[in-house]
UniProtKB/Swiss-Prot annotation:
The gene is erb1. Component of the NOP7 complex, composed of erb1, nop7 and ytm1. The complex is held together by erb1, which interacts with nop7 via its N-terminal domain and with ytm1 via a high-affinity interaction between the seven-bladed beta-propeller domains of the 2 proteins. The NOP7 complex associates with the 66S pre-ribosome. This is Ribosome biogenesis protein erb1. Component of the NOP7 complex, which is required for maturation of the 25S and 5.8S ribosomal RNAs and formation of the 60S ribosome. The lineage of its organism: Eukaryota, Fungi, Dikarya, Ascomycota, Pezizomycotina. WD repeats lie at residues 421-460, 464-504, 555-600, 606-644, 647-692, 696-737, 753-783. Residues 1-12 have a biased composition (Basic residues).
Length: 783
């Protein structure tokens, strides 16, 4: 019975170790400790004081966290008195077992005798490891707390340990011992005395290692990596495009000339002796530099005022409310006093409230006196004062006197006809020279011809399936009916079947005359065709387009946005403003009679960005080319740059030349529309800058146009705000008088679609009528 109990007890506090296990659970287990425990203390488990610390460590090393959960907690009262004898027998038999066996049972308790002589099981205290939050006080630690050791100077001990025993004062060596200790310095020696123990203070190995790392500028913490990859919390998203693709400037790689000049100045000054090395001043020089005290009242003569002296303005005289005994009507009542006190100091009408003191001797000091004087001094010191002579001028007299719009009629005032049929935006329109037909082009890729007065559609052709028709223009002259339309990167020349057969036949002959000239030229070689600046060859249209009236196609390979005819009808210029268009092929001039295309510019126009539009002068061999910010005039006969016009706009959208521009009519006049909502009038005889700048639109201006005949001095502009504005602009031949500009009418009727309003405008050649094309898919005739 006793043997079974003791065996159960051993199972509760120990665990078996497999024979193949080569590694114990405790890292601190040592072989010499294990041998000593088995050889010396195996038969002496019942003694009280013979159990060594090595056995305790051995039991702790063999114990495991998992086994600790399964162990049963045993108290000394639960163990019977005869359990000790059975345990002794079991322990005696255990010594006879094989020492190499891994089934050794280690005990974590010892047997002592209680007061009645019975066996008492005393369990060892648990030693927490480094990961535990609990730590026991060392047995020899001084536990007196924060009390100074000077209190124990008259006692042989210096404190008490955890068990209440006295800690005796360590013996002090003689001077010879101190000398020997200083010669043979032990590891961790500091030369200091530990105040808690009275012994020499020695540093541990960990403290020495910490000091070594600090001295060597190393990181004290183990496993810390100071070069971990940076975590970009706010800029971790990779940017594909650079913030600035500008090339590095040359000044980054060339020595600074500015600094070289400054250095040479200093070198020259040193050579000339103007810059001397520093020398400490002598006592005589210090005496010469002493501060001299001047008598402030030595010269009391009055000095004349400065010529620019302006006397300070006088203070206003005091009123009745500032009197110490004001009339009763100036005294505030309770409501007014409360409102004044609750108001903000900046919102008060006055800085004080009138009071009635009865007599002058009862008047106290004014609390805001110093503040008011200080603010007045600040005003006199900081605020500039200027003498001004007042001019009595009527503002109305400064404005120019404009004639009444009723005196400048006729001009369009109302919508007469609406043209509907396009799907999507109507990008362009043009009225033919006879004034009978209207040609339009839109996003649906079709070019249509309408009867102007009735709005009836007469002819339509599908020029492109994907690309919109960007521009349509009639050939000048009434002898032929030829329509030029640009869709995508092709230009189409068509003869709509709307005129009488004689005019239609003449139109076909004009276009067909160029095929013979083109056939006489040798075809370009394969190497020339691969070049980008090779002029394109005019080709015949497809069968479906030929049946619709298209006679010739010019493949430019780049999108055309502008087309303008010469006044004689044999030349027209086109502009491809795309950013991907090479500079040498952006502007092209086409000859109708020869079926010839030429690129007059070899390089991109300097300054102002890519070209936007171009027009021929109505009476001179001059070509005007506009890029984003400037307009350049080229003399085609002399092949020279004549003039550079600077409108000052951010982005030029369109421009037009006055039809009567010549030296006889007072010089050339232009109007320029820009995407920054400005309409600019240029008189080239006055300046390259704008003569007038008109800002009447809320959005970008898309198109501007003069009336083609000199009969009506009218011009109009079209804007994305859905409105057209009609102006009167008269130009006289007198060089001493300037052009007069009068706003006449604002025409509204188009709906804003997709942030776009009116895209194009054109005038009737003989009447004061205009036609507009809108993004809402309609065209309107204004009369």
């Amino acid at each position: 019975m006793d043997a079974s109990k003791s065996s159960k007890k051993r199972k509760a506090v120990t665990r078996d170790v497999e024979e193949e296990a080569g590694v114990f659970s405790g890292d601190e287990l040592q072989v010499d400790v294990l041998d000593g425990a088995l050889s010396d203390n195996a038969n002496d488990l019942s003694s009280d004081e013979d159990v060594s610390d090595s056995e305790i460590e051995l039991v702790d090393d063999f114990s495991d966290e998992e086994d600790g959960d399964e162990e049963e907690e045993l108290d000394s009262d639960e163990i019977p008195s005869d359990g000790g004898e059975s345990f002794k027998k079991a322990s005696g038999t255990g010594n006879a077992r094989d020492e190499s066996s891994s089934d050794e049972e280690q005990l974590n308790y010892r047997i002592e005798k209680d007061a009645n002589g019975n066996d008492r099981y005393v369990y060892d205290e648990i030693n927490p490891d480094d990961n535990s939050d609990y730590s026991d006080v060392e047995e020899n630690a001084n536990t007196i707390g924060n009390i100074p050791l000077s209190f124990y100077d008259q006692y042989p001990h210096i404190g008490y340990d955890i068990n209440g025993k006295k800690i005796m004062r360590p013996a002090t060596g003689e001077a010879l011992d101190a000398l020997l200790d200083s010669i043979e310095i032990p590891k961790g020696w500091t030369g200091l005395t530990d105040p808690s123990t009275g012994k020499p203070l020695e540093l541990s190995q960990d403290e020495l290692e910490l000091l070594r790392k600090v001295q060597m500028n190393e990181i004290p913490e183990e496993g810390y990596n100071p070069y971990e990859p940076t975590v970009e919390w706010f800029s971790s998203k990779q940017e594909i495009m650079p913030l600035s693709a500008a090339p590095e400037p040359k000044r980054r790689f060339v020595p600074s000339k500015h600094e070289a000049k400054r250095v040479m100045k200093i070198v020259k000054a040193i050579r000339e002796g103007r810059i001397l090395p520093y020398k400490p001043p002598t006592e005589e020089e210090d005496k010469e530099q002493d501060v001299v005290n001047y008598d402030l009242w030595a010269d009391e003569t009055e000095r004349p005022d400065h010529p620019m002296h302006i006397p300070a303005p006088k203070l206003p005289p005091p009123g009745y409310e500032e009197s110490y005994h004001p009339p009763p009507e100036y005294l505030p009542d309770k409501k007014e006093r409360k409102a004044w006190e609750e108001a903000d100091p900046e919102d008060r009408e006055r800085e004080y409230l009138p009071n009635d003191f009865g007599s002058l001797r009862k008047v106290p000091g004014y609390e805001s006196f110093v503040k008011e004087k200080f603010e007045r001094c600040l005003d006199l010191y900081l605020a500039p004062r200027v003498r001004r002579s007042k001019l009595n001028i009527d503002p109305e007299s400064l404005l120019p006197k404009l004639p009444s719009p009723e005196e400048l009629k006729p001009f369009p005032t109302a919508c007469a006809t609406v043209f509907r049929g396009h799907k999507g935006r109507v990008r362009t329109l043009a009225v033919d020279p006879s004034g009978l037909w209207l040609a339009t082009g839109g996003d649906d890729g079709t070019a249509r011809v309408w009867e102007l007065l009735t709005g009836r559609q007469l002819w339509s052709v599908k020029l492109s399936e994907e690309d919109p028709v960007n521009v349509v223009r009639w050939r000048p002259g009434k002898d032929a009916v030829i329509l030029a339309a640009a869709a995508g990167d092709d230009i189409f020349l068509a003869v709509p079947p709307i005129a009488d057969p004689k005019i239609e036949k003449t139109s076909l002959e004009i276009i067909d005359a160029g095929w013979g000239y083109a056939a006489s030229k040798p075809p370009p070689s394969a190497a020339e065709e691969n070049k980008k600046n090779v002029p394109p060859q005019w080709i015949r249209p497809s069968l479906s387009l030929a049946e619709s009236g298209v006679c010739a196609v010019i493949p430019l390979r780049y999108v055309v946005k502008s087309l303008s005819w010469h006044r004689r009808g044999d030349y027209f210029v086109t502009v491809c403003p795309g950013s991907s268009t090479p500079a040498s092929v952006a502007i092209s001039i086409h000859t109708l009679s020869k079926h010839l295309t030429q690129f007059p510019f070899r390089r991109r126009i300097k300054g102002g960005g890519p070209p936007q539009t171009a027009h021929f002068h109505p009476s001179k061999p001059i070509l005007f080319v506009a890029n984003q910010r400037t307009i350049r005039a080229y003399d085609l006969s002399r092949q020279l740059l004549v003039k550079i016009i600077q409108p000052g706009a951010r982005w030029i959208s369109s421009f037009d030349i006055h039809p009567t521009s010549s030296t006889a009519s007072g010089g050339d006049n232009l109007i320029v529309g820009s995407y920054d909502r400005r309409l600019l009038w240029h008189d080239l005889e006055l300046s390259q800058r704008p003569y007038k700048t008109l800002r009447y639109h809320r959005k970008a201006i898309r198109s501007v146009r003069f009336h083609p005949s000199g009969r009506y001095p009218l011009f109009a502009d079209a804007s994305d705000d859905g409105s057209l504005q009609i102006f009167h602009g008269s130009v006289t031949g007198d060089m001493l008088s300037n052009a007069s500009i009068v706003p006449l009418k604002v025409l509204k009727g188009h709906k804003i679609t997709g942030e776009l309003g009116v895209l194009d405008v054109d005038w009737h050649p003989r009447e004061a009528w205009c036609v507009s094309a809108g993004a809402d898919g309609t065209c309107r005739l204004w009369m």
